[in-house]
Every structure is written in structure tokens, then in C-alpha cells.
């Protein structure tokens, strides 16, 4: 759309970061595009919500509630059992799940994933909104390990009960190699969203906060390589 969004309100005067956009299907079948992002006022961060139908005009509004603290709130692409759903990281360490009747207010969250592997031992987060597949909700995650190294992993959540983790990758999907190590923020690969085209997952990701890469992988192949969670 060739639109550039600039800070326009005090909470975001010093930054609008990590927008996680999703194509959201409303109850009546119409489509709205939402984007959650982190606003920074130089001292504090907050969650904000962008909304657009055409990517030419946007509205922005605050997101409140204990589950919206921190960074990385990512909306599901539709309601589940009549409620909005979102991935959260309110404690800044684990991946959580929140539900709400009000897209602007998220009161509580429950933990669905804690660090288990060395590459994610320090911190977990999501890499954008879940992608609906026949097997479940495909969630890309990021993990932070030794030397503040960021890697990208994946989870599979139950379609009807997203709080239930069905499977997960034991090893990272993308890990910083020699070409990813140097840059403004070294040892980091990070994404705010991917999309599926037929059986291909297209994953844009940032490298060292300096350049962008794009990876593709079979959706079925990715899911089949996961380890089932008991």
C-alpha cells in the first residue's frame, strides 16, 4: 500500500515496534486486518491495536489489561467458541494464551509453554499470529538462549482448545549461523508473522536487526517433524 505509519500519540512518540498483522474473519464472514504492536514512550512500553480494511487508512487504539502487559500480543485469525483469542507473554518469559469478549481488553492469561530446550532456556515468545491448519493452530515461536541468541521454533495447538499443546519442535526451525551473527543486534533471527500458501509456509524474518531473510518450508513437513506432547 506504500503507507508508512508514524507515531501520532504520546505512548508511541519514541517507537512503534514489532507489528503482528493478521487477516481476521469476523462472525459475519467479512474480513478486517488487525495489527498489534508495541508502543514506546522512552520510559514505558504498551500494546496498541491497528485496524484497517484497505491498508490505506488505519485506526489505532490502546490495548489494556493484565494479559496485555509486556510485548508480543498476537491475535488469532478468528474467534474460538465466540471469544477473541491471543498469544501473550505477560511475564516476559513464557508463552501464554488469553481470551476476551473485548478485543481491546485482556484480563487474564494462562501459560501454555515454558522453556525446555537449551536454545530457549532464557525466554520464549511468539513470532506472530497462529496459522489455522487441519492439524491444529500452527504457532511460530522464538526462544532466547545463551549469549542472548534468538532462534525460531514452532508449536501446534488444538483447534478447539488452543490451551492444549499437541506437538512442538525440539530443535529450532531457524538458528543464527555465521551469516546471521554480525549486525546491529548480533545472534538474532526474529519474525513477527508468516503465512501459508497452499502447503508452503512463507516466513520472513529479521536478521541481527539489520537485514531481512525469507525462508519457506512445507506446512505438512513442518508439522510431521514435531514431537508429540504427552
Which sequence ranges carry the predicted segments?
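Signature of short aromatic-glycine-proline-rich micro-motifs recurring in repeat-based ectodomains
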Residues: 18-20, 127, 183-194
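Beta-rich carbohydrate-recognition and catalytic domains
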Residues: 1-14, 22-74, 78-122, 132-184, ...
